[in-house]
């Protein structure tokens, strides 16, 4: 339903500068929050889940920014008012950069909760993100196609690092009570108690 609202209907979100907001909501906030609720049956972990959901949404929106960055002239020619058409490449290039930085800042309470070792994850992500952003600033047209994949891979790297940080460093009771319904010894044998 939301995919249809994104591109079709009487007021397609992607044609009116709302595509990025829709991606943050429907590729980040909604799926992460409801997946957590479905797996745990509770909203108790919201202080970590809400920032995580927004971070995932921001990183997913960066894929859309690269796509719209590439297609700016074509979109403008057919009156498709993406954020890149509205604000320009320079501004949206900055938004791309800051989306990744803000996403990592949103994760600081969780990284701090997990352990100092888990801080490797956002540092590695930021290095990848800044490298991709530098390429974005220098590229136009078809040169941006590989950056779509790199931006998506950056999101995947973030998600995998977050997963491993949680698996390796969550206290046993958190894994059992909130994430794995007391099946942590079967589902999550690496959930090592932290004293």
Predicted regions: what is each one?
Residues 1-4, 44-66:
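Membrane-embedded alpha-helical segments that form the functional core of polytopic membrane enzymes
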Residues 1-8, 47, 97-143:
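Transmembrane helix-loop-helix
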Residues 1-43:
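Intramembrane alpha-helical segments
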Residues 21-36, 56, 84-89, 149-162:
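Small-residue-rich segments of transmembrane alpha-helices in multi-pass membrane proteins
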Residues 21-25, 49-54, 93-97, 119-121:
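Hydrophobic alpha-helical transmembrane segments
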Residues 31-53, 105-118, 163-182:
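Helix-coil boundary and interhelical linker segments in multi-pass alpha-helical membrane proteins
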Residues 57-101:
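Solvent-exposed interhelical
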Residues 177-195:
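Transit-peptide-like, low-complexity N-terminal presequences
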